[in-house]
A protein has these predicted regions:
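Bacterial N-terminal signal peptides
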Residues: 12-21
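Blade-edge motifs of beta-propeller repeat domains
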Residues: 26-41, 72-94, 130-150, 183-210, ...
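Gly/Ser/Thr/Pro-enriched helix-cap/hinge segments flanking short amphipathic alpha-helices
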Residues: 32-37, 348-485
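Beta-propeller blade termini
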Residues: 42-52, 72, 96-106, 152-162, ...
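Hydrophobic beta-strand segments that make up the repeating blades of beta-propeller
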Residues: 55-62, 112-116, 168-173, 228-232, ...
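Short glycine/acidic-enriched loop and turn motifs that connect beta-strands
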Residues: 64-66, 118-121, 174-177, 235, ...
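A short loop-to-beta-strand structural motif that recurs across blades of beta-propeller domains
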Residues: 69-71, 126-130, 179-183, 238-240, ...
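Glycan-association/targeting regions that enable binding to alpha-glucans and other polysaccharides
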Residues: 478-549
Length: 549
């Protein structure tokens, strides 16, 4: 098994760092407490653990001043700004606003696609594909074949041919001749434009051939193949079903939406009937522009149930997301604009904005568990939102594909607890934000998941039974059982400064987030190059995860 390499800065003493090598093998309380980001003026976000330390990080785009921000989760509720690590890869005019993590090369770490993101077509430029090599990002878009110059504003990862390699679909705004593009992953680090042969050489409007709205890829007709939903700004929204033979076929559904100002989209099974429903957030101020709750009827048919489920949003709706923020077993709904939080009460949505959080922030529109307590935290425009919990139980599941793509994008998980059955599908982004690629199940007062079925894109089906609640587990495709997920823990005892000629002895306790089953630490080294020492000094093992220098 290949050696995995994880780098984490743990000492504030100059630039002293450790490198570690792993061998594979209450009543009245609001739901969220909010904390403003250091750079609050940002737009979209992608959530994921880019350095494999067990703590999810965030990449933010459309930021004032820096354009983008890469924030590293320190594991103590704080985030360190790592934007400088990727700043040199960013074109001068890039805004971002369309970003998604995924392990496109199946090497075990999250790579990052960043859409150019400028809505001015005359200032279009290239997109970025940032390959992650042990926590170091390098733009490889040109060598990977992603050379088209467009005003791309969002993208999704999917494995449309189910060959185990993630493909990419991009939304491109602009002139009538512009098209959205589908890139097939060749499995060798390169991509090929297969838009035409896949049946997607489609003009979405007379003014702009591309969609200029949110995208979502998911299995909308329950046949095991990922389909495409395309929200179109000022034109009809579209649904393309995957025929399993390499082509997409457009399905006409009247209730998918009139030609309004479609913006973002939320995807999830809000009625717990086992299929993917949609919430289409739509801008504008007319009745034509109202947002839509679209109930999946199967076979590509959707029913507009917006008023029936208690939602009436007409004015300028933008970013949105589904997540079970109260852990009761059904998906709640949030809107960044207008600022609204809806609680799902058995299929009826109730506005609980005033009870959800306090502070002068828009609510969260993407979801993750950044403090690893099992409850869904939120990410918004200007702030992150810590879920205070309510005593209900949860289960979180992280997938690792073997025959399927590494992230398990496209996999379906069905959790059964007594009479409660919930379905989650791992998505490779959606719209202008990306949720953490971890399936979260709120269980209410239930303390055990009776049965967990995982349907992988490869066709493999794994079944686990009798899983205790209140934990995060990792499931490897085709392996029996599951593995508990534990984050990295680092403890160091160091002097305040180094003195020339003096003897220095350091001790560090290392308990990393080992990724593979049976993995173990092979060695720990210190990089002293920025304090006048060598680049690599091996520490001596003292037992129980303790190493000395």
């Amino acid at each position: 098994m290949d050696t995995a390499y994880v780098r984490r800065f743990i000492f504030s003493l100059c630039a002293f760092s450790l490198l570690i090598f792993l061998a594979g093998g209450a009543e009245g309380q609001t739901i969220f407490s909010s904390t403003a980001w250091q750079n609050p003026e940002c737009g979209g976000s992608a959530l994921g653990d880019f350095d494999n330390d067990g703590w999810p990080d965030v990449f933010r785009t459309e930021c004032r001043g820096t354009r983008v921000a890469l924030m590293h989760n320190e594991g103590d509720g704080k985030f360190a700004d790592r934007t400088g690590d990727i700043q040199t890869a960013m074109p001068d005019k890039l805004l971002g606003y369309g970003q998604t993590f995924a392990d496109y090369d199946n090497d075990g770490d999250l790579d990052l696609f960043v859409a150019f993101g400028n809505w001015n077509y005359s200032q279009r430029d290239r997109n970025l594909l940032l390959r992650n090599d042990r926590g170091v990002f390098t733009d490889v878009a040109q060598e990977a074949g992603l050379t088209d110059v467009n005003a791309t504003d969002n993208a999704v990862w999917l494995d449309y041919d189910r060959d185990g390699w993630l493909d990419l679909y991009t939304a491109n705004l602009g002139q009538p001749e512009v098209r959205n593009l589908l890139y097939r992953n060749n499995g060798d680090g390169t991509f090929a434009d297969v838009t035409a042969e896949a049946g997607l050489d489609v003009s979405f409007s007379e003014e702009a051939g591309g969609s200029n709205g949110a995208l979502a890829a998911g299995d909308f007709n329950d046949d095991g193949w990922p389909d495409l939903y395309v929200a179109v700004f000022r034109a009809r929204n579209r649904l393309f079903l995957n025929d399993g033979q390499g082509r997409f076929v457009e399905i006409t559904s009247e209730d998918l939406g009139d030609p309004g100002q479609a913006f973002d989209v939320a995807v999830g099974d809000f009625d717990n009937d086992g299929d993917l429903d949609l919430f289409q957030a739509t801008g504008g101020l007319s009745q034509e522009d109202r947002s839509l709750v679209l109930l999946n009827l199967g076979e590509g048919e959707f029913l507009d149930v917006t008023e029936a489920v208690g939602i009436s949003v007409v004015g300028d709706a933008q970013d949105t997301g589904f997540g079970d923020i109260d852990d009761d077993g059904d998906l709640d709904l949030t809107l960044g604009q207008p600022r609204t939080v809806f609680r799902n009460d058995g299929g009826i949505f109730v506005d609980i904005t005033d009870q959800a959080y306090s502070g002068d922030f828009a609510p969260p529109v993407a979801f993750w568990d950044y403090d690893l307590d099992g409850h869904l935290d939120g990410q918004g425009y200007r702030a992150r939102f810590l879920n205070n919990g309510n005593g209900f139980h949860t289960l979180q599941v992280e997938l690792v594909g073997i025959e399927s793509n590494r992230n398990g994008i496209g996999a379906r998980l069905i959790a059964t607890t007594g009479e409660l059955e919930q379905m989650r599908e791992i998505l490779g982004g959606r719209g202008f934000n990306q949720d953490e690629m971890v399936a979260h199940f709120g269980l209410g007062e239930r303390a055990m998941v009776d049965r967990l079925e995982i349907r992988w894109p490869s066709g493999q089906v794994d079944v686990l039974t009798d899983i205790p609640a209140d934990r995060k587990i990792r499931v490897f495709e085709g392996h029996e059982g599951y593995y508990p997920v534990k984050p990295s823990v680092w403890e160091a005892i160091l002097p305040d400064s180094l003195v020339a000629g003096a003897v220095f002895q350091g001790t560090v306790a290392v308990h990393p987030a080992l990724f593979e089953p049976g993995a173990e630490i092979t060695r720990v080294v210190a990089d002293l190059s920025q304090v006048g020492g060598p680049e690599e000094v091996e520490l001596t093992a003292a037992g129980d995860g303790v190493y000395r220098l």
